[in-house]
């Protein structure tokens, strides 16, 4: 086949330009990426060979070889993994079929340390070769096929693909033509040091070919780290494994290395990152826990190994009870896998509960990073909601710190049986909301919910350990009776309603269909009015979210609660007693103000502005 010259995808061209003109200080990460790719290639073929043994006939011992060729100025990485044919080379090296490249470019921060981590996270690690090489030559033969193909590029917008007559066994060889200014990478001592730094956890043996002695030296132990005893593994080895597996620059916050024995046997080596992962809420996010069966890599995609709300976990799970020849499709609804998932979930939640109690400051940082994802589990039917709620923390309006639901309950006032919350986008704005001023004045705490998911999970978790979870926007909250009997409360409610009937009727008459009802508030202490919803109605913030998502068309009419102790409301009431009904514009302004404070749209902004101007004008003249 004659040579075919092709242009890189535009996005790949941007990546190449970035790598070629890289200012990254840690350029040796190219070795981490290429070794990781070679290991993946061996893992893929090992898996396929369980059902197609002929693919590894005559060469079933997988290995990776690294060679420094000083005479020709090359670093060569060779594996006997699955290999690539012409189509694979074009798809994998010439284009990015997935959204990885675009996301990579979008997430670049300008911080070289963080951007180094992104290189591997977004699947563009191969291109890091151009940090140190001015030309890259890839020779490959796919397992089960005879033809050998060569891919070559200088990284300047195009590449060449051609067939080759070279005698070449299965696998892939990457030859990096090292830049003159990067020739220190040809030094054997440095090469071996770099490979050892990034490879000890790799389960495939990695050899260094010493051209002087004409022999190969194994550089890694080639035993999967998770199969070793914890006492044999240093903290540094755990960290390096985590960083290589996760393409991370941070250290893990929590390391869980456990061997589960009994009815179901498996080993897990799991990490909770100390920094927020870039794709936590990305639509194309992946769960990054790899499944192995008897040390054979099976998959890290499309398997239900961990619940979605624990997707921040990194690591591996190695099962002894699943058959090696199981298909990926069969893993979707597998009883053994479901038991492993349940055991891991229980273990992780137990570890989080311990951390919450023992290291609250560290836990606050974890929660800021991953709490939003964790709370998604409260919306899932299969979740043990109470166990999950035990590890949730929320901002306390009364104490201005993060507390758990159990801590909130310990702070109940005498006779209190309800957990109050208020949801919104900004905790500072929530603190000044009229909805909670009465509760706080009585030292009744309110939890501030600021994640979108909060509005969903409270709809399916209306209580915790026998205590009702209630929004402070509900109409039936009476701060004076919050810790008293319902019988006393009903008597006082009737008295207030009768006493101020003329006031509420007047507001109803003026506002008409803009309100569902007008009531005397039992929760306001200083503000003139607030919007509220009945017990059965949708929470105000939840309704607003559904309108934004076009799930419902229009906002429903809300109740308007009035504070008779407020001077403005008192003035309107006294005017009514004097048969003066000339406060229509003031009534409308009070309603508009209540809407604004709740984040609701004002029906007529022009009229609102005029009313406000008129009142200000009267005040200064």
From Swiss-Prot:
Keyword Mitochondrion on entry: no
Gene Ontology CC annotation, any one: cytoplasm
Region described as A: spans on this chain: 1-328
Principal subcellular localization: cytoplasm
Region of interest: C: 545-621
Region (B): 329-544
UniProt keyword terms in alphabetical order: ATP-binding, Chaperone, Cytoplasm, Nucleotide-binding, Stress response
Residue pairs linked by disulfide bridges in the UniProt entry: none
InterPro entries in the cross-refs: HATPase_C_sf, Heat_shock_protein_90_CS, HSP90_C, Hsp90_fam, Hsp90_N, Ribosomal_Su5_D2-typ_SF
Entry's Gene Ontology molecular function annotations: ATP binding; ATP hydrolysis activity; ATP-dependent protein folding chaperone; unfolded protein binding
Compartmental location: Cytoplasm
Biased composition (Basic and acidic residues): 486-498
One Pfam match: HSP90
Stretches for region Disordered: 478-498
Top-rank lineage group of the source organism: Bacteria
Stated role: Molecular chaperone. Has ATPase activity.
Similarity annotation: Belongs to the heat shock protein 90 family.
Assembly information from the UniProt record: Homodimer.
Protein name according to UniProt: Chaperone protein HtpG
Organism name: Rickettsia bellii (strain RML369-C)
Record gene name: htpG
